[in-house]
Amino acid sequence: MVEINRKTKETDIKCKLNLDGCGKININTGVGFFDHMLEALSKHSGIDIDLTCSGDLHIDAHHTVEDCGIVLGQALKKAIFPISAVERYGNATVVMDEAATTCALDLSNRPFLVYEVNVSGKVGDFDVELVEEFFHAVAGNAGLTVHIIQDRGRNKHHILEASFKAFAVALRRALVKNEKLGIPSTKGVL
């Protein structure tokens, strides 16, 4: 179990994360759709996430979403590294009705994000462009290389939910224990 707390003039976030969990969820960011996406991430990764955020929602959800990504990324980095005896790579294609999204990731300790999800506008009152900000913050702070690519879809909610679930399943697969691998790098370090 790792714990990260972060307080700025814009947000106050408390996060507990357990990689060896079973997807126990306690999430409250004040942004309903975003909470729903984080719950999907926790459930489908098998990672216990306890996250609360008090943010400047009177402005908009940008700081809340981005800062939650920063904190979740920091918690993942603290929980994952130094890395040893895991698969390291994970990928998944997840469908939700007409939508399909693929995520491939590497626990590389080299942050990089490719985000090719073609949605714009809002789901309810949630600006969908914030999802890219979230994944950029997670990848950057966790030290992950992440590719999220929309294969098909029309419904924004379905496309974004498939994206979060694909990331979750790919992460779960990358974290699968494999004692034969030791440090999963020809360099001997990640």
Curated annotation (Swiss-Prot):
Gene Ontology biological-process annotations: L-histidine biosynthetic process
Principal cellular location given in the protein's record: cytoplasm
Pfam family, one: IGPD
Keyword list, A-Z: Amino-acid biosynthesis, Cytoplasm, Histidine biosynthesis, Lyase
Signal sequence segment: none
EC number: 4.2.1.19
GO molecular function: imidazoleglycerol-phosphate dehydratase activity
Cellular component, GO annotation: cytoplasm
Keyword Amino-acid biosynthesis: yes
Reactions this protein catalyses: D-erythro-1-(imidazol-4-yl)glycerol 3-phosphate = 3-(imidazol-4-yl)-2-oxopropyl phosphate + H2O
Class of enzymatic activity (EC top level): lyase
Pathway listed: Amino-acid biosynthesis; L-histidine biosynthesis; L-histidine from 5-phospho-alpha-D-ribose 1-diphosphate: step 6/9
Homology family: Belongs to the imidazoleglycerol-phosphate dehydratase family.
Protein name: Imidazoleglycerol-phosphate dehydratase
Gene: hisB
